Amino acid sequence: YAGITIDFEGLKGDTIKQNYVTFLKELDAALPQGKTLYVCVQPDTWYTGFDYRGIGEAADKVILMAHDYQWTSVPDSYAGTTNTDSPVTPFASVYEALRDLTDPATGVADRSKLALQISFGSAGFHVDGEDRLLETTIYHPAPSTLALRLAQPDTQVVYSEEFRNPCALYTTEDGSRYKVWYENEQSVLDKVALARMFGITGVSLWRIGNIPADGAYDVWSALLTQR
């Protein structure tokens, strides 16, 4: 093996923050020579148990998981409304996460260690012809399913300049209409450019076998242009 990747999520509080860095430094010291230590971190807006500066000192690579911002539930009061703004990676939130990770006082000091993780989650809603919510269930179509829907001639794709995320409107075989937020070539390249603005040139992809590379939905080829 080449090394270890640590992905502990949901960490909160000063005690955990201190103990986690101690654990990582001890782990790094225990690894055989030449083995790498990668550490995944979450945005500290909600998860306060990540000491970015300390983690950066212990790790060979720090991977920022600034994704999956979509809703986890929908209030019943939203049914019948057009409130479906649930982008998976709203640009302002990703910006805030990158800013905090690279903060001169508390962030990772060596920016060459940093990578922005790109994930390919989705958030879909069952809507009527006026885009009103018919139910409060959130659907999560896989990239392979989205590729098929995006290839349909009647599918509409709208790119939100506010969120820098696309949403697709499509109809299934039974006549049901869905609105789905997801990642596409443009949204991924926008985040790559944003990361570069902070001096971050590394990208991490979640996960192998889940990266869209279809004719109508080809993020992989777009990423290769940034090498």
Name what the model sees in each region.
Residues S187-L205:
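Conserved, well-ordered alpha-helix/loop/beta-strand core segments that scaffold catalytic motifs
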Residues W206-I208, P212:
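C-terminal functional modules
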Residues G3-G10:
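Short acidic, glycine-rich surface-loop motifs adjacent to enzyme active sites
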Residues A2, D60, T201:
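Receiver (REC) domain switch/active-site residues of two-component response regulators
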Residues T15-I16, Y20-T22, Q33-K35, P212-R227:
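Short acidic, glycine/proline-enriched helix-loop-strand junctions
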Residues K113, F120-A193, W220, L224-R227:
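Glycan-binding loop/region signatures in secreted carbohydrate-active enzymes
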Residues G13-L146:
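Substrate-binding surface in catalytic domains of secreted glycosidases
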